[in-house]
Amino acid sequence: MGKQRVLSGVQPTGNLHLGNYLGAIRNWVEIQDQYDNFFCVVDLHAITVPHNPATLAADTYAIAALYLACGIDLKYSNIFVQSHVSAHSELAWFLNCITPLNWLQDMIQFKEKAVKQGENVGAGLLIYPVLMAADILLYQADKVPVGEDQKQHLELTRDIVNRFNHQFAKDKPVMKLPEPLIRKEGARVMSLTDGTRKMSKSDPSELSRINLLDPPDQIANKIKRCKTDPVKGLTFDDPERPECNNLLTLYMLLSGKKKEEVAAECQDMGWGQFKPLFTETAINALKPIQEKYQEITADKGYLESVLRDGREKAETVANQTLADVKAALGYSAPV
């Protein structure tokens, strides 16, 4: 029996930050030898909200380079660009046609983002979860690493699979039911300016996040200015001190220390002691990623070859799934 397959991806919108790394990519790296992995740069998702066409291609390559710099190993994993595999868009259309509108209108992320965009909200944002379902189902993924905020989208994917197989493939299901792969620690890294909100690329304040490619002086400045409280003695899990819990968690994850060690080390500290310690830890943790990124981006031909190989491998799997779906729907084969 072969390895189970994992599918995940990140949008090429803005810089990758500690939330992306600790909540997703580092987890991929740690488990990649256990699975057959398909890691995608989801650039089709990137245009569901206003984007900059002048930087989309460069941002896409930057994310792929960061995958490699963070430790994604091509011996175990396949890296490709979503828009380079046309089956994503085609399967998304077929799934859109069988997905009830009210399922999509109930998605929490759509409701939140639609409020921000008002009358300018696009249909792409509404059907975003169906495209995500297509991404997963094309590769017959067994496991999908998701944060708590994406669990609802994965549940929708499972509902779509069940609906499709029931209507069109009862005797021989053509798409697999994916399961979530959830990491509790680090799954939700919070903002440096508000410990109750998730660290996000879309936050207008650069001070809210530490980007993977931030130079040391920027990291130091962001930590120096991050939101804290006047209480001496730093503790985990106090609901009245969300920023304290977040900063201790970040320090724990970046230092590699156990929670008990950090709790004992920091229980009598003030912020004046902790912030320099956290700053040094963050800078040292990101230095090898930044050095590897510079090495990879210096050789564009290498990165292009990685994405070319990735596309070819992805197409082999995706096109077979797409052919099975089209046959189940009754489409004629190309002549």
Curated annotation (Swiss-Prot):
Catalytic activity: tRNA(Trp) + L-tryptophan + ATP = L-tryptophyl-tRNA(Trp) + AMP + diphosphate + H(+)
Signal sequence annotation: none
InterPro entries registered for this protein in UniProt: aa-tRNA-synth_I_CS, aa-tRNA-synth_Ic, Rossmann-like_a/b/a_fold, Trp-tRNA-ligase, Trp-tRNA-ligase_bac-type, Trp-tRNA_synthetase
Keywords from the UniProt entry: Aminoacyl-tRNA synthetase, ATP-binding, Cytoplasm, Ligase, Nucleotide-binding, Protein biosynthesis
Entry's Gene Ontology molecular function annotations: ATP binding; tryptophan-tRNA ligase activity
Binding site for L-tryptophan: 135
Cellular localization per UniProt: Cytoplasm
GO terms under biological process: tryptophanyl-tRNA aminoacylation
Chain positions recorded as ATP binding sites: 11-13, 19-20, 147-149, 189, 198-202
GO cellular component annotations of the record: cytoplasm
Record-linked Pfam families: tRNA-synt_1b
Assembly: Homodimer.
Name assigned to this protein: Tryptophan--tRNA ligase
Species per Swiss-Prot/TrEMBL record: Nostoc sp. (strain PCC 7120 / SAG 25.82 / UTEX 2576)
Lineage: Bacteria, Bacillati, Cyanobacteriota, Cyanophyceae, Nostocales
